[in-house]
């Protein structure tokens, strides 16, 4: 729900997290402040990459690792912006780096960690994109669970959109465990 027309990037969004209908900058203090963790992890990752010696005869994947580290930093900044400003443009600043990170890391996990070829990796990422695209729009069925009473609306306020990432994480984790990676 926004306060004005659907096409304005500065429209306020009041449908998410602990904000309610409070337009104040610090209406979501826990969500806003917790994003510092992403910034700290990104800085620590960049320092680690800078200090790690190159090993002769091994491929150097620093560019991809640095890109993922940059996305972690962008997640922290974008999420802070969304949870303080709560506008349409800040929502994109929040979700775009998260989506790019998920896709990039899933492709990395399939290709580098699990050893898939390029075609299976591409197909896996494409399937992941489709799952992400449609899972957040699954309508609630009244009476399914006590919290699904909003029949016809996206279930759990669209939070089912996170299920493909959780499933992918679990499947990759189990596969790595079975490979003893």
Please annotate each region the language model reported.
Residues 2-181:
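Multi-pass alpha-helical transmembrane bundles in non-GPCR membrane proteins
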């Amino acid at each position: 729900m926004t306060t004005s027309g659907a096409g304005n990037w500065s429209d306020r969004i009041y449908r998410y997290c602990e904000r309610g209908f409070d337009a104040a900058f610090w209406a979501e203090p826990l969500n806003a402040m917790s994003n510092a963790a992403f910034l700290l992890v990104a800085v620590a990752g960049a320092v680690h990459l800078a200090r790690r010696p190159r090993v002769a005869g091994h491929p150097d994947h620093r560019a991809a690792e640095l890109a993922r580290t940059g996305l972690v930093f962008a997640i922290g900044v974008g999420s802070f912006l969304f949870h303080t400003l709560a506008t349409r443009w800040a929502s994109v600043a929040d979700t775009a780096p998260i989506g790019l990170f998920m896709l990039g890391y899933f492709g990395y996990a399939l290709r580098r960690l699990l050893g898939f070829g390029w075609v299976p990796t591409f197909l896996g990422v494409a399937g992941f994109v489709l799952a992400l695209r449609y899972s957040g729009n699954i309508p609630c069925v009244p009476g399914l669970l006590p919290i699904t009473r909003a029949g016809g609306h996206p279930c759990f306020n669209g939070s089912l959109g996170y299920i493909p990432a959780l499933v992918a994480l679990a499947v990759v984790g189990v596969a790595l465990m079975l490979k003893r990676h």
